């Protein structure tokens, strides 16, 4: 199934969670925090301004982004977990 985000929304796939600490301790699933980093899979056409013009998004498909831990809505597509979020939930683009 494909999904096309609307307006200023993005479809983001979280980066893989860490399985071990730097010291080699295996982290159980119950203690793992959801990563706040991901890759943008799809972007909407942009936000509509007050004047009626569409404003393009700064984030592009393929960008690695840092986002708020509590931002976005979890969705499951074809057995994979994704987030749908607004561009405002993105804290920065990683380079």
UniProtKB/Swiss-Prot annotation:
Write down the SMART domains for this protein, in alphabetical order: Cpn10
Keyword Cytoplasm among UniProt keywords? yes
* InterPro entries cross-referenced by the UniProt entry: Chaperonin_GroES, Chaperonin_GroES_sf, Chaprnonin_Cpn10_CS, GroES-like_sf
GO terms for biological process?
Answer: chaperone cofactor-dependent protein refolding
**TM region positions:** none
Highest taxon listed in the record's lineage:
Bacteria
Q: Quote a single Gene Ontology cellular component term.
A: cytoplasm
> According to its UniProt record, where is this protein located?
Cytoplasm
Q: Name one Pfam family in it.
A: Cpn10
UniProt main location, coarse = cytoplasm
Keywords of this entry: Chaperone, Cytoplasm
- Select a single GO molecular function from the record's annotations and give it: protein folding chaperone
Q: What does this protein do?
A: Together with the chaperonin GroEL, plays an essential role in assisting protein folding. The GroEL-GroES system forms a nano-cage that allows encapsulation of the non-native substrate proteins and provides a physical environment optimized to promote and accelerate protein folding. GroES binds to the apical surface of the GroEL ring, thereby capping the opening of the GroEL channel.
Q: Quote the subunit structure annotation.
A: Heptamer of 7 subunits arranged in a ring. Interacts with the chaperonin GroEL.
Record's family? Belongs to the GroES chaperonin family.
In Swiss-Prot or TrEMBL terms, this protein is called Co-chaperonin GroES
Q: Whose protein is this, by species?
A: Desulfotalea psychrophila (strain LSv54 / DSM 12343)
Gene name in the database record? groES
């Amino acid at each position: 199934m494909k999904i096309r985000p609307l307006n200023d929304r993005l479809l983001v796939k979280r980066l893989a969670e860490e399985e071990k600490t730097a010291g080699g301790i295996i982290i159980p699933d119950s203690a793992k925090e959801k990563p706040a980093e991901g890759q943008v899979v799809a972007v909407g056409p942009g936000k509509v301004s007050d004047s009626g013009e569409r404003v393009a998004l700064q984030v592009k498909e393929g960008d690695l982004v840092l986002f708020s831990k509590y931002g976005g809505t979890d969705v499951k597509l074809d057995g994979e977990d994704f987030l749908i979020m607004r561009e405002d939930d993105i804290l920065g683009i990683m380079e």
